[in-house]
Design a protein with these regions (language model features):
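Mobile "lid/hinge" segments at catalytic clefts and subdomain interfaces of large enzymes
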Residues: 8-55
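Hydrophobic faces of well-ordered beta-strands that scaffold small-molecule active sites
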Residues: 1-2, 93-95
Length: 121
């Protein structure tokens, strides 16, 4: 499920287009939806606690004004843990990096995943 938008889907500093979660622990569709709902509610609270907007991007995920992909990933990991699940076992994080957006001058560049400030870190 798509939970954070960046790239072409949002007007923020994230270069990754979609941050998603996959509820691996779920045995039924209903259980999967409940897991995702709980994580999304906790993510929303974490975003609000950082004084970011909880507005959504083009694909329905939150689109907070975050500049670093790592910061978005950390928020998602914290929301998974806060929801009582283990990241990587109960719930997996999936990414749509939109590789076509990383293509420049005939080559793919991982540096395009980061803002110029983040690339300097």
């Amino acid at each position: 499920m798509n939970i954070v938008n960046g790239g072409a889907h949002a007007n923020n500093g994230l270069r990754i287009q979609e941050f998603m979660i996959r509820p691996d622990k779920a045995k039924t569709f209903s259980e999967a939806m409940n897991i995702c709902f709980l994580i999304i509610q906790n993510l929303k609270k974490l975003i609000k606690d950082k004084n970011f907007s909880t507005a959504v991007g083009d694909e329905g995920g939150f689109a907070p004004m975050i500049n670093k992909n790592e910061d978005a990933l950390n928020l998602i990991i914290k929301s998974i843990i806060k929801s009582g699940y283990v990241n990587g076992r109960d719930v997996s994080i999936c990414l749509d990096v939109a590789a076509n957006e990383l293509h420049k001058n005939g080559n793919y560049s991982i540096c395009l995943l980061y803002t110029s400030d983040a690339a300097d870190d």
